[in-house]
């Protein structure tokens, strides 16, 4: 028996398009119009509350929490060091974004605080950052102080939180 050889140029027959099939045979969940008529959130309205809009400044990440203890602060700084971020300390007398000199969004639009010394390149211990923070607080006790974690590879600020609020700022 001789082997059969198929030619690559031979065409295969394809059936012509016959149109879409009817969807009447597919299962469909039908709801009665009566089942949606009694839907109400009326029972939940009494327990809803509105967030207070005045006298409730929120500054940065973790600002909704009570002030951080020394241990909590060291844990946060340790977290940013473990991620390879560079700690920076900043301070400001106001503590939140505002526009004083300009209404156009540019470099000096109120988002930048004064940096305390230089970023702490090469820092690998949270207590070093804490000592610098205490020195900054001693020099500027009436200012807000925050810790920033800067990623020098991505060139972005990855974390920022208030580490100290001056007395009477709440």
Swiss-Prot record:
Location of this chain's protein in the cell = Plastid, Chloroplast
Coiled-coil portions: none
- SMART domains, per the entry: RuBisCO_small (SM00961)
Among the Pfam families in the record, one is RuBisCO_small
For this UniProt record, give its keywords in alphabetical order, as a comma-separated list: Calvin cycle, Carbon dioxide fixation, Chloroplast, Photorespiration, Photosynthesis, Plastid, Transit peptide
Give any GO molecular function from the UniProt entry: ribulose-bisphosphate carboxylase activity
A Gene Ontology CC term for this entry?
chloroplast
Chief location of this protein within or outside the cell: plastid
User: InterPro entries of this UniProt entry?
Assistant: RuBisCO_ssu (IPR024681), RuBisCO_ssu_dom (IPR000894), RuBisCO_ssu_N (IPR024680), RuBisCO_ssu_sf (IPR036385)
Q: Which Gene3D superfamilies does this entry report, sorted A to Z? A: Ribulose bisphosphate carboxylase, small subunit
> Which additional comment does the entry carry?
The basic functional RuBisCO is composed of a large chain homodimer in a 'head-to-tail' conformation. In form I RuBisCO this homodimer is arranged in a barrel-like tetramer with the small subunits forming a tetrameric 'cap' on each end of the 'barrel'.
Role of this protein: RuBisCO catalyzes two reactions: the carboxylation of D-ribulose 1,5-bisphosphate, the primary event in carbon dioxide fixation, as well as the oxidative fragmentation of the pentose substrate. Both reactions occur simultaneously and in competition at the same active site. Although the small subunit is not catalytic it is essential for maximal activity.
Q: Which family does it belong to?
A: Belongs to the RuBisCO small chain family.
In Swiss-Prot or TrEMBL terms, this protein is called Ribulose bisphosphate carboxylase small subunit, chloroplastic
Per the UniProt entry, what species is this protein from, by scientific name? Zea mays (Maize)
